[in-house]
UniProtKB/Swiss-Prot annotation:
It is found in: Cell outer membrane. Transmembrane segments: none annotated. A lipid is attached at residue 22 (N-palmitoyl cysteine). A lipid is attached at residue 22 (S-diacylglycerol cysteine). The lineage of its organism: Bacteria, Pseudomonadati, Pseudomonadota, Gammaproteobacteria, Enterobacterales. One of its GO terms (biological process) is cell division. This is Peptidoglycan-associated lipoprotein. PROSITE patterns: OMPA_1, OMPA_2, PROKAR_LIPOPROTEIN. The gene is pal. Residues 59-173 form the OmpA-like domain.
Length: 173
């Protein structure tokens, strides 16, 4: 008898607890969180982006190639907001040129194991891909690859060298 009463009380309380817990706002995520960044950037108007036409395809592609490298902090795969304009322009270009394909390479510095660096390099490439897809780019246009620490652009054991190697590079195919 007592257990039936407890069960009834719990049956009544559980939906109330669930309702109240869902009605309170969740804690805001760190502004460096990649999901928050994607959400904020996706909400921006596409009208702000440059309009690309067939007339200036080569010229536009050359401009985009100049901003083809995204750098990352140590042990991090989140795209920094300072790359938003370049990535937004690239997304707009790819949306207007659906036959254009890109490959995103993920790279790391030499610190860490080979296995971890391959994983982190892939996460970096995937973060850039996810950002572009959030802007409407087809996943059929993007491939990713991780090179880990195997293709450094700077050699040395100082932060100056390390920071140049923590990157994703966009290759136009």
């Amino acid at each position: 008898m007592k257990s039936k009463k407890i069960f009834k009380i719990l049956t009544l309380l559980l939906p109330m607890i669930t309702t109240f817990s869902c009605s309170f706002p969740k804690n805001k995520l760190n502004s460096n969180n990649v999901d928050t960044f994607y959400e904020q950037e996706t909400n921006k108007s596409k009208q702000q982006l440059t309009n690309f036409s067939e007339d200036n395809f080569d010229e536009t592609l050359e401009k985009l190639k100049k901003g083809n490298t995204i750098y990352f902090p140590f042990n991090n795969h989140q795209v920094n907001s300072k790359y938003a304009k370049n990535l937004n322009d690239l997304a707009q270009f790819l949306c207007h040129h659906s036959n254009q394909k890109i490959m995103i390479e993920g790279h790391t510095d030499s610190r860490g194991t080979n296995k971890y660096n391959m994983y982190l390099g892939q996460k970096r490439a995937d973060s850039v891909k996810l950002y572009l897809e959030s802007k409407g780019v087809s996943n059929q246009q993007i491939t990713t690859v991780s090179y880990g620490s195997s293709k450094p652009v700077a050699h040395g054991n100082k932060e100056n060298s390390y920071s140049k190697n923590r990157r994703s590079v966009i290759i136009y195919q």
